[in-house]
Amino acid sequence: MTNLKAVIPVAGLGMHMLPATKAIPKEMLPIVDKPMIQYIVDEIVAAGIKEILLVTHASKNAVENHFDTSYELESLLEQRVKRQLLAEVQSICPPGVTIMNVRQGEPLGLGHSILCARPAIGDNPFVVVLPDVVIDDASADPLRYNLAAMIARFNETGRSQVLAKRMPGDLSEYSVIQTKEPLDREGKVSRIVEFIEKPDQPQTLDSDIMAVGRYVLSADIWPELERTQPGAWGRIQLTDAIAELAKKQSVDAMLMTGDSYDCGKKMGYMQAFVKYGLRNLKEGAKFRKGIEKLLSE
């Protein structure tokens, strides 16, 4: 079994969520009572990963601080006998989990962001989890499905894995996947035959499958990333490097189990907030009544 490190690229500017993200990192926008990035880290830890690398930017100090120990806050909560809150704060970075930071000096794309993590990862396989996409942990057990299943399959086959989902409609802003066999049920795996970042003419592709922002990558991706030239939007794209790797060896796409929300965009963020708000143990029932009242007006 391979001990994998996870990379979370958090250096993006969050332009789809402006003006909220002008001074606040999009990864720190709350979904009820936890910032978006916390859901991502919880998913990674549930999949069995103990070392996490945040690729950050000078404007993202709040993300780094979130995972640092706040001795003053913990002391205050202890003095005031706020044991539940203290436990929640201390669980932000669970025992045995290490969260490190590296900087991406220039916004040159997701592929470049991953390359910034190479000195900390070495010539080893690794995991990439995009912080925009939150997978609903109530719709799929993170101990068994999606990222956990991808890691298990990678350990079994040695092949790189890409999580995918069906997305009927306009795919021009997504990474579109074509597979050898149809992905017609949750958890099904098929070899990737084409992988295109933000296609100019998505209607010409016989596919409604997009990448979900979860990757388990073999060490063979490093040379491909080094050779990748700027692509869509003038950025070095991880998708382009994976597409080149798929020409040389099998790369699998796995159809996601459960539901996900693109929280890097307003609609996905609002949907996630409502979904998590409705099942919040403390306030969910009141929240539901409030929404029902608003809808009835």
Curated annotation (Swiss-Prot):
Q: What family does the database annotate?
A: Belongs to the UDPGP type 2 family.
What this protein is called in its record is UTP--glucose-1-phosphate uridylyltransferase
The UniProt record lists the keyword Cell membrane: no
Q: List the pathway annotation.
A: Carbohydrate metabolism; nucleotide-sugar metabolism; Bacterial outer membrane biogenesis; lipopolysaccharide biosynthesis
Which GO MF terms does the UniProt record name?
Answer: enzyme regulator activity; UTP:glucose-1-phosphate uridylyltransferase activity
Q: Name one GO cellular component term.
A: cytosol
The domain of life is Bacteria
Q: Which reactions appear under catalytic activity for this entry?
A: alpha-D-glucose 1-phosphate + UTP + H(+) = UDP-alpha-D-glucose + diphosphate
Q: What is its EC number?
A: 2.7.7.9
Q: Does the keyword Repressor apply?
A: no
One Pfam family linked to the record: NTP_transferase
Keyword list (alphabetical) reads: Lipopolysaccharide biosynthesis, Nucleotidyltransferase, Transferase
What biological processes does GO assign it?
lipopolysaccharide biosynthetic process; UDP-alpha-D-glucose metabolic process
